[in-house]
Amino acid sequence: MAQLTVQIVTPDGLVYDHHASYVSVRTLDGEMGILPRHENMIAVLAVDEVKVKRIDDKDHVNWIAVNGGVIEIANDMITIVADSAERARDIDISRAERAKLRAERAIEEAQDKHLIDQERRAKIALQRAINRINVGNRL
C-alpha cells in the first residue's frame, strides 16, 4: 500500500514525523487534499490546521496548528516548513484563549488610534490564536 511521509519543521526543530494515507492542508489558493502519488509541487500555506490520517490506524487523525509556511510534495514525501506549528495534544487552550483576548484588545486599540500596521499584526495574532484554539479542541 502506498503511503506518504509527513514532516513538519519549524526553526525550533522537527515537530511532526509520521507516515500517512491522507493529508489535508489549506494553501493561499484554497484547500488541498493529498494522497500517495500526488503530483510534485510547492505551495504557500495559510494559517490553518493540517489534518493527517495516519497509516497505522485508519481512524487515527493527527491535527497540527500551522502558522503559515511552505509545503513541498515530492515523491510521496510531504515537508512543511513553518514559523511555528503545534500538535493538538501540545496546545495549551487557556493560553491560546488569553492570546486571543490580547489580540482583540490590540485590534481595538490600533483601530482607535488608526495604527494600520499594528492593526494588521494584531489581526494575524488573532488568526493564529483562533487556529490554535480550534486545533486544540480537536482532541
Swiss-Prot record:
GO terms for molecular function: ATP binding; proton-transporting ATP synthase activity, rotational mechanism. Disulfide bonds: none annotated. GO terms for biological process: proton motive force-driven ATP synthesis. It is found in: Cell membrane. Its main location: membrane. It holds the Pfam family ATP-synt_DE_N. It is a peripheral membrane protein. Induction: Induced by a decrease in external pH from 7.5 to 5.7. GO terms for cellular component: plasma membrane; proton-transporting ATP synthase complex. Keywords: ATP synthesis, Cell membrane, CF(1), Hydrogen ion transport, Ion transport, Membrane, Transport. Belongs to the ATPase epsilon chain family. NCBIfam families: ATP_synt_epsi, PRK00571.1-3. F-type ATPases have 2 components, CF(1) - the catalytic core - and CF(0) - the membrane proton channel. CF(1) has five subunits: alpha(3), beta(3), gamma(1), delta(1), epsilon(1). CF(0) has three main subunits: a, b and c. Produces ATP from ADP in the presence of a proton gradient across the membrane. This is ATP synthase epsilon chain. It comes from Streptococcus pneumoniae (strain ATCC BAA-255 / R6).
